[in-house]
Curated annotation (Swiss-Prot):
It comes from Sulfolobus acidocaldarius (strain ATCC 33909 / DSM 639 / JCM 8929 / NBRC 15157 / NCIMB 11770). This is Argininosuccinate synthase. The keyword Transferase does not apply. L-aspartate binds at T116, N120, D121. NCBIfam families: argG, PRK00509.1. The lineage of its organism: Archaea, Thermoproteota, Thermoprotei, Sulfolobales, Sulfolobaceae. ATP binds at A6, Y7, S8, G9, G10, L11, D12, T13, T14, G114. Transmembrane segments: none annotated. PROSITE patterns: ARGININOSUCCIN_SYN_1 (PS00564), ARGININOSUCCIN_SYN_2 (PS00565).
Length: 391
């Protein structure tokens, strides 16, 4: 039997290599997908072979992640429950896509992953595999063996597998779009998140940072007048605004699997870009377009979070989003200081704002007759309803 394992290099998936080999008498091929995590990929490959993999692949998917996935997180203002920029959720379908490519290439009968039975990721991995490689068997060792961390360490030692046991008390998942932090005291939603949990948003600079972001058709193309591709924009902003302490998210999240969980994220570039994009949208769309786009954004975010990337509705929403975003071009001016961001102004290329109409000091004013007629018609629904109800 041939099995392809989505391999992170951590304890769970390292132990899974040997467990899969022995349990299924299988040849295990491992695939690590680089979506921007700060890992030592040489050491990960080395660890995979020592644990028993017959072949290992490291795939650089950072540019792919930015251009095909994060681009839509920006265009669709991807925020689950209006706060979480979907950093972990967004990467999972891409990881599965790359794993499936290898599985099909070598003719693997099964795909394995390290998700547990309590997490959202099992839903995202399983549904993506079913969509892209329905004939493959899905194996999630952590859902089967029910090993604690200590038991996993004991198992690895018994098999002579040198393991990386992180000194950190936190469980970290990291990619280009964000860093999620779980475990230890963070699990208690009544407790303050310790400062040692953070890495990307540790304030190392006290100055007031001003940034201009230029958008073209809904996507950022310049930072402070310097042209760069989307991957570079994200990397630059993560460093610039993260070092000023901006980009932390903490909330009680409604998981796909039926319970609430305290979640903490560091998402500096994501928040700056989404907030700026939303501001430019508001300055450009008609009121009806703006309300419609907000409803699309919410539906898109829910689908991505729930692991339904391959749901046809997601693609339909993106087509509408592309059509609306063709008008989102211009500049947004922001300021970041002491962990806070504020928008200083914006210039939308297609903004219908008219100073002549909006100014109180000059230009157009409706007549008294026009104002009275508008107000009468505008309020008619409410006034007639009150009268019919006797209130």
């Amino acid at each position: 039997m041939k099995i392809v394992l989505a391999y992170s290099g951590g304890l769970d998936t390292t132990v899974a290599i040997r467990w899969l080999r022995e349990t299924f008498n299988a040849d295990v091929t491992t695939v690590t997908v680089d979506v921007g995590q700060k890992d030592d990929f040489y050491q990960i490959e080395k660890r995979a072979y020592i644990a028993g993999a017959i072949k290992h692949y490291t795939i650089d998917a950072k540019k792919d992640f930015a251009e095909r996935y994060i681009s839509y997180a920006i265009k669709m203002n991807g925020l689950y429950e209006d706060i979480y920029p979907l950093s972990t959720a967004l990467a999972r379908p891409l990881i599965v896509e790359k794993v499936v490519e290898i599985a099909k290439k070598i003719g693997a009968e099964a795909i394995a992953h390290g998700s547990t039975s309590k997490g959202n990721d099992q839903v995202r991995f399983d549904l993506a595999v079913k969509a892209l490689y329905p004939e493959a068997k899905i194996i999630a060792p952590a859902r089967i063996w029910n090993m604690t961390r200590d038991k996993e360490i004991e198992y690895a030692k018994s098999k002579g597998i040198p393991i990386k046991t992180e000194s950190s008390k936190y469980s970290i998942d990291e990619n280009l779009w964000g860093r999620s932090i779980e475990g230890d005291i963070i699990s208690d939603p009544s407790k303050e998140v310790p400062e040692d949990a953070f890495e990307w948003t540790k304030k190392t600079k006290d100055d007031k940072l001003k940034i201009s972001l230029t958008f073209d058709k809904g996507l950022p193309v310049e930072v402070n007048g310097e042209k760069m591709d989307l991957l570079k924009v994200i990397q630059v902003l993560n460093e610039l605004v993260g070092s000023r302490g901006f980009g932390r998210v903490e909330h009680l999240e409604n998981r796909v699997v039926g319970f609430k969980s305290r979640e903490v994220y560091e998402v500096p570039a994501a928040l700056v870009l989404i907030n700026s994009h939303k501001d430019l949208e508001k300055s450009t769309y008609t009121p009806l377009e703006f309300r419609f786009k907000r409803s699309l954004d919410g539906q898109w975010s829910d689908l991505v979070y729930q692991g339904l990337w391959f749901e046809p509705l997601r693609e339909t929403i993106q087509i509408a989003g592309d059509n609306l975003n063709k008008w989102i071009s211009g500049e947004v001016f922001i300021e970041v200081e002491n962990g806070n961001m504020k928008i200083l102004g914006r210039k939308g290329k297609f903004s219908p704002f008219s100073e002549e109409i909006a100014s109180y000091n000059k230009g157009w004013y409706p007549s008294d007759e026009m104002a009275r007629g508008f107000i009468e018609i505008f309020g008619m629904h409410s006034l007639v309803a009150r009268k019919s109800r006797g209130i």
